[in-house]
């Protein structure tokens, strides 16, 4: 109990909660108080301590909301309060599965209507946090795209649903590329959205990612290797090609590279498989790249290429928005998976072996 009182005192001092008189503050400042107090609640407490903390914070927030003058700002504060509960108490429920606390949270936010026009009072980030907090707790089986579909069909406000759905679309495309599920959401946007700019953006994303979906011809490229020789993807036609897109400055890439390089020995008898690395360091950082390859003893073991950002379209053609990226191409030069799981992933061997087997059947 002593610990929780110290934590609570810290929050009070930080927010200046010693007084319950907020008459000198404008509505904007009071809204910021409501938002901040929930973000300061730790969730590494036991159930009783957390509930006590939440009750204290809720009491404080109630006083703040009572001090807000405009009706619109009061409603916005209540929505921020709901968001705060979903990401404080809600996070604890999500981690522990505590049914009693979930029921308690449900009672506290039962007034929330996701289709309420009041949600337009929030900015896009707060709307997304409120919706995602709600979905995470009460519709946990929905994927990010499923959530977008739910919003399209159950929330009337274009101001609310357009940015939420487009954000989900972009996020999923960056993680998985163009899939049937993506196609379904774009069709839902065409059907549900009344905003031309939203439909146009969805079409632009389709045009960007569709060419690198499964089964399409992989865009050819030509890059310099570590020995100064120009190498094309098409040079390897008739062989399967597995590519690791990385950079020396990328911690996750450097961490994953040994696993990728180890595939050389694991698949040494697979003569129709080419392992290939492509560095995003850029030709201007060639010396650093070469030094890294030599120091790590990777030089000469597989073809190592480097992007010339001034003339290569590789990053654009393959929709490289983050690295590391792994790309698998079949013997005919068609994309098997342009968002392949990393070699260090626990499911890699199972997935990769199955893909190799399927490609060799053709």
Spans of features found by a protein language model:
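A short beta-strand-turn-helix
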Residues: 222-241, 265
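Conserved redox-active cysteine motifs that mediate thiol-disulfide chemistry
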Residues: 237-238, 245-265
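Short, internal strand/loop/helix patches
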Residues: 290-331
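Bacterial Sec-dependent N-terminal signal peptides
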Residues: 1-25, 359
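Alpha/beta-hydrolase fold active-site loops
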Residues: 240-241, 273, 324
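Thiol-based oxidoreductase modules, predominantly thioredoxin-like and allied folds used
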Residues: 270-286, 298-311
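Oxidative protein folding and maturation machinery
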Residues: 24-220, 224-227
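Thiol-/selenol-based redox modules, centered on thioredoxin-like
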Residues: 328-362
């Amino acid at each position: 109990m002593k610990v929780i009182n110290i934590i609570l005192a810290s929050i009070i001092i930080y927010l200046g909660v010693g007084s319950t008189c907020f008459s000198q503050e404008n509505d904007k400042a009071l809204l910021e108080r409501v938002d901040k107090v929930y973000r300061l609640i730790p969730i590494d407490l036991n159930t009783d301590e957390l509930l006590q903390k939440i009750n204290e914070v809720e009491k404080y927030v109630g006083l703040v909301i009572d001090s807000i003058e405009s009706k619109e700002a009061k409603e916005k504060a209540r929505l921020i309060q709901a968001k705060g509960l979903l990401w404080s108490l809600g996070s604890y429920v999500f981690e522990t599965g505590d049914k009693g606390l979930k029921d308690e949270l449900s009672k506290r936010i039962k007034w929330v209507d996701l289709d309420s026009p009041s949600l337009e009072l929030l900015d896009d980030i707060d709307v997304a946090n409120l919706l995602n907090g709600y979905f995470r707790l009460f519709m946990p089986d929905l994927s990010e795209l499923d959530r977008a579909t739910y919003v399209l069909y159950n929330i009337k406000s274009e101001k609310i649903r357009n940015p939420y759905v487009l954000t989900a679309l972009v996020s999923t495309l960056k993680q998985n590329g163009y899939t049937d599920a993506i196609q379904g959401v774009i069709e839902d946007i065409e059907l549900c959205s009344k905003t031309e700019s939203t439909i146009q953006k969805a079409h632009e994303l389709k045009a960007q990612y569709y060419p690198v979906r499964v089964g399409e011809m992989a865009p050819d490229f030509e890059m310099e290797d570590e020995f100064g020789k120009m190498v094309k993807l098409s040079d390897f036609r008739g062989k399967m090609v597995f590519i690791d897109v990385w950079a020396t400055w990328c911690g996750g890439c450097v961490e994953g590279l040994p696993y990728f390089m180890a595939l050389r020995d694991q698949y040494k008898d697979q003569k129709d498989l080419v392992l290939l690395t492509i560095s995003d360091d850029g030709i201007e950082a060639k010396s650093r790249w070469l030094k890294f390859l030599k120091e790590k003893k990777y030089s000469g073991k597989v073809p190592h290429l480097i992007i010339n950002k001034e003339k290569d379209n590789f990053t654009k053609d393959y929709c490289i928005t983050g690295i590391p990226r792994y790309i698998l191409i079949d013997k005919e030069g068609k994309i098997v998976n342009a968002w392949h799981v990393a070699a260090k992933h626990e499911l890699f061997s199972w997935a990769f072996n199955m893909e190799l087997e399927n490609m060799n059947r053709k």
